[in-house]
């Protein structure tokens, strides 16, 4: 039986830890919404379930010119903090405001957005088969090409030198960020590869697929170390904890599993009574808790050692698409997520109250990421929006 009582202040400190670590967040592709979240999943054809154009071929030109930045939000960009019933919490309110916008960042829907662990760059992945790198003044730097179909996920290595990506082309690729070259292609999955990440030391790569398996690869030679038939539906998200000892996986089967990364064995299984499809999982900064995004308009914070839910965050809309959530610890201790109502939501980690909503996108917000060292949030949305928005807070 899940428990939804508030965690103590000590638990909150344990959740966020003393450092943010360098794990990349793991946004999940918006390209395949869940039509019928039931034991017999009905999954739309990739790239078609939400009425977007089919993925294009390789060869889309890299953007040679710098996209225009807009630092002045229009009248519809309301970022005032949501009124709070508890005045004593006012000093904990985030004050995010729109400070920059990259229009037409990609040619198709943006499936992921990530800051590099060193905080110097931002990456964005898209259904247009490209990953673009942006400087922190949000000026275009370069494009990484190599996949034949749309990008479902990408993640940075902890030293910010490499990017691993996965695609509907059933491949996992590793790119050298400095040169922009694909340096390794990992083959083995038999269906769309939905998620991928490096372990903190950069020695392992994990991936999850619509073939219902998790693969752990040697990052040096690209060989498969483990192929794990870990779920009964597509694997939607994978994430290492901060020391790399454990790998979490989430699936449309409604289950989160924790794996020993050295043996490939399952050490914990998390499932609640409702078991809605899981679309994203992320370890807390200290690696002791897991934040799971669910296709029933909830985020759940699990104490996976005790197999219980510590917190449940609600108020946003998420019942159709794969939307990622993040921890923000550079200012207050917050949970950040996109939403199908075109907004970004920010919750107080401890009280579960919505502190602020960020308005400005005109389609479902699939991707958010929090800068590792500054109070900055990046967000991106489905077609036809295709804009990256940058929000900054003074608190």
Swiss-Prot record:
What does the UniProt keyword field contain? Repeat, WD repeat
Residue ranges of the WD repeats are 105-135, 146-176, 188-218, 230-260, 274-303, 315-348, 360-392
Q: In what ranges is there compositional bias, type Polar residues?
A: 63-81
Q: Which Gene3D superfamilies match?
A: YVTN repeat-like/Quinoprotein amine dehydrogenase
Please describe what happens when the gene is knocked out: No obvious phenotype at 20 degrees Celsius or 25 degrees Celsius. At 20 and 25 degrees Celsius, double knockdown mutants with wdr-5.1 have increased fog-3 expression. At 25 degrees Celsius, these mutants have increased fog-1 expression, reduced brood size accompanied by 42% embryonic lethality with 100% of the surviving progeny being sterile. Surviving progeny display defective spermatogenesis to oogenesis transition with 88% of the gonads only containing sperm.
Positions of the UniProt region annotated as Disordered: 1-31, 63-83
Cysteine pairings via disulfide bonds: none
> Could you name the domain of life of the organism this protein comes from?
Eukaryota
- Mind telling me which Pfam families this protein's record contains? Beta-prop_WDR5
- PROSITE patterns, sorted: WD_REPEATS_1, WD_REPEATS_2, WD_REPEATS_REGION
Q: Which GO terms describe its cellular component?
A: axon cytoplasm; cytoplasmic microtubule; kinetochore; microtubule associated complex; neuron projection; neuronal cell body; nuclear envelope; transferase complex
The processes (GO biological process) annotated in the record are: brain morphogenesis; establishment of mitotic spindle orientation; germ cell development; microtubule organizing center organization; nuclear migration; retrograde axonal transport; vesicle transport along microtubule
The molecular function terms of the Gene Ontology recorded here are: dynein complex binding; microtubule plus-end binding
Q: What job does the chain carry out?
A: Sex determining protein required in the germline to promote the spermatogenesis to oogenesis switch during the late larval stages of development. Acts with the sex determining factor tra-1, and redundantly with wdr-5.1, to regulate fog-3 expression, which in turn determines germ cell fate. Not required for methylation of histone H3 'Lys-4'.
- Entry protein name: WD repeat-containing protein wdr-5.2
The organism is Caenorhabditis elegans
